Amino acid sequence: MAAYLLAVAILFCIQGWPLGTVQGQVMPFMEVYRHSVCQTRETLVSILEEHPDEVSHIFRPSCVTALRCGGCCTDESLKCTATGKRSVGREIMRVDPHKGTSKTEVMQFTEHTDCECRPRSASGVNSRKHKRNPEEGEPRAKFPFV
């Protein structure tokens, strides 16, 4: 992977900026690529989706930030998946609309610590791959490995 990134960086330097663009107005390829890869990233997580048993209360804020896996894999048969997790606390305000009371408290949320591209489940993309005729061979890799 490092060799590929180096080769792309060298190619980009040789070719220079695309005509008609000004540095700063267009995000360079390597930066776009670096931001798109499978990695942990700050994500907004709904408190009620994370704690569905708490529907009788109102929370402020209604969502919190947590690191979650996201991004693209080099093959559509792969999915960016969490390989490490931890529990983190976030201080929120719990409002009880029936009693008209509120209090701050710490709630626990799952945060991803490590991510990697792993095969998707048997449904979707992989199921198409399994139905291929053996004479067809494997599908050709898509960009950036064309």
Curated annotation (Swiss-Prot):
Domain of life where this protein originates: Eukaryota
Record field: transmembrane: none
Tissue: Expressed by the venom gland.
MF annotations from Gene Ontology: chemoattractant activity; growth factor activity; toxin activity; vascular endothelial growth factor receptor binding
Region listing for Disordered, in residue ranges: 119-146
Gene3D superfamilies: Cystine-knot cytokines (2.10.90.10)
Modified residues (Pyrrolidone carboxylic acid): 25
Disulphide-bonded residues: 38-80, 69-115, 73-117
GO biological process: induction of positive chemotaxis; positive regulation of angiogenesis; positive regulation of endothelial cell proliferation; positive regulation of mast cell chemotaxis; response to hypoxia; sprouting angiogenesis; vascular endothelial growth factor receptor signaling pathway; vascular endothelial growth factor signaling pathway
Signal sequence bounds: 1-24
InterPro entries: Cystine-knot_cytokine (IPR029034), PD_growth_factor_CS (IPR023581), PDGF/VEGF_dom (IPR000072), PDGF/VEGF_growth_factor (IPR050507)
GO cellular component: extracellular space; membrane
Keywords, comma-separated and alphabetical: Disulfide bond, Growth factor, Pyrrolidone carboxylic acid, Secreted, Signal, Toxin
SMART domains, sorted: PDGF
Biased composition (Basic and acidic residues): 133-146
Function: Snake venom VEGFs may contribute to venom dispersion and prey subjugation by inducing vascular permeability and hypotension. This protein induces vascular permeability probably through VEGF (VEGFR) signaling. This protein also induces a drastic hypotensive effect after intravenous injection. The hypotension is mediated by nitric oxide (NO), which is produced by VEGF-activated endothelium NO synthase. Also induces angiogenesis in vitro.
Subunit and interaction comment: Homodimer; disulfide-linked. Interacts with VEGF receptor-1 (FLT1) with a high affinity, whereas it binds to VEGF receptor-2 (KDR) with a low affinity. Does not bind VEGF receptor-3 (FLT4).
Family: Belongs to the PDGF/VEGF growth factor family. Snake venom VEGF subfamily.
Annotated protein name in UniProt: Snake venom vascular endothelial growth factor toxin
